[in-house]
From Swiss-Prot:
The lineage of its organism: Bacteria, Pseudomonadati, Pseudomonadota, Gammaproteobacteria, Enterobacterales. It holds the Pfam family Glyco_transf_28. It is an enzyme of class 2 (transferase). GO terms for cellular component: plasma membrane. Pathway: Cell wall biogenesis; peptidoglycan biosynthesis. This is UDP-N-acetylglucosamine--N-acetylmuramyl-(pentapeptide) pyrophosphoryl-undecaprenol N-acetylglucosamine transferase. It comes from Escherichia coli O139:H28 (strain E24377A / ETEC). UDP-N-acetyl-alpha-D-glucosamine binds at T15, G16, G17, N127, R163, S191, I244, A263, L264, T265, V266, S267, E268, Q288.
Length: 355
């Protein structure tokens, strides 16, 4: 499908969970001849990341309202109005055929600006429970898509766009069949790490002994303390790294993952075809729990919520999964994934632009 001459504006910001899926769709459409610009904020990760991907970015001034004091709430209508006015001026100059909202505060005024100019608004919700901005914008959107069932009652489930190197991994039955020796446990707390996993997993390693080998991503500034915790637990042989640059290689190495359940993490693990033990971050709206639930229901994962998390709970769960069980779970994870999510979102953007 050629997009020669078509213009898209992507609205996404704040966290990797919003920005990376937006980049995947942007690159897919650019390969079809689309022009793409980005709407973001100057003080969040998109300001650096998006230009590195060869996409020009325009900035508006907006920040979140949750947890702010009374003064900020009183000033909010004026701030939103000003951000809407900035976004409207940017869109009048760029003249996009369609805008794609991938979440983050920037999508709110951006979506309203597009709607007020008669530009189609397409939304994608990455999480299992809809964010505040997308809940508002869904009322005026041309098309609403969701990664997991349940965020919106009637929206099409299209999955989350996932990195191509993860999608290119061999299927679980090719990758895991015939593996022997200690079970390979990949521990991932996200880029910031997860203190609870950093504290718990060295003790789990001590309980499981040589039945497992662990690769533990500790997050920024925690590598030394986590290495020390493994050593003090009598388990110095396990690998601890601050970051993992090549997640596809880490997934290829692993037999099972112990991790948080951010939207992209869950989608990547399903696409890779890996069993998982999820420890959702305790959001007020239990967002990460709802992200992980479809894989638990599919028999591909287990959820242990943080209040129930203990060394014994993790150790007993991992010890109870034989290699045969892990392979079955891995196959179920892959079967539950939506590997063509990027194409599905891109196709809806194209349709909205032609409508």
């Amino acid at each position: 499908m050629s997009g020669q001459g078509k213009r898209l504006m992507v609205m996404a910001g704040g966290t990797g969970g919003h920005v990376f899926p937006g980049l995947a769709v942007a690159h897919h459409l650019m390969a079809q001849g689309w022009q793409v610009r980005w709407l973001g904020t100057a003080d969040r990760m998109e300001a650096d990341l998006v230009p590195k991907h060869g996409i020009e970015i325009d900035f508006i001034r907006i920040s979140g309202l949750r947890g702010k004091g009374i003064k900020a709430l009183i000033a909010a209508p004026l701030r939103i109005f000003n951000a809407w006015r900035q976004a409207r001026a940017i869109m009048k100059a760029y003249k996009p055929d369609v805008v794609l909202g991938m979440g983050g505060y920037v999508s709110g005024p951006g979506g309203l600006a597009a709607w007020s100019l008669g530009i189609p608004v397409v939304l994608h919700e990455q999480n299992g429970i809809a964010g505040l901005t997308n809940k508002w914008l869904a009322k005026i959107a041309t098309k609403v898509m969701q990664a997991f069932p349940g965020a919106f009652p009637n929206a099409e489930v299209v999955g989350n766009p996932v990195r191509t190197d993860v999608l290119a991994l061999p299927l679980p039955q090719q990758r895991l069949a015939g593996r022997e020796g200690p079970v390979r446990v990949l521990v991932v707390g996200g880029s910031q790490g997860a203190r609870i996993l950093n504290q718990t997993m060295p003790q789990v390693a001590a309980k499981l002994g040589d039945s497992v080998t662990i690769w533990h991503q500790s997050g920024k500034g925690s590598q030394q303390s986590v290495e020390q915790a493994y050593a003090e637990a009598g388990q110095p042989q396990h690998k601890v790294t601050e970051f993992i640059d090549d997640m596809a290689a880490a997934y290829a190495w692993a037999d099972v993952v112990v991790c948080r359940s951010g939207a992209l993490t869950v989608s990547e693990i399903a696409a890779a075809g890996l069993p998982a033990l999820f420890v959702p971050f305790q959001h007020k709206d239990r967002q990460q729990y709802w992200n992980a639930l479809p894989l638990e229901k599919a028999g591909a994962a287990k959820i242990i919520e943080q209040p129930q998390l203990s060394v014994d709970a993790v150790a007993n769960t991992l010890a109870g999964w034989s290699r045969e069980t892990l392979l079955t779970m891995a196959e179920r994870a892959r079967a539950a994934s939506i590997p063509d999510a990027t194409e599905r979102v891109a196709n809806e953007v194209s349709r909205a632009a032609r409508a």
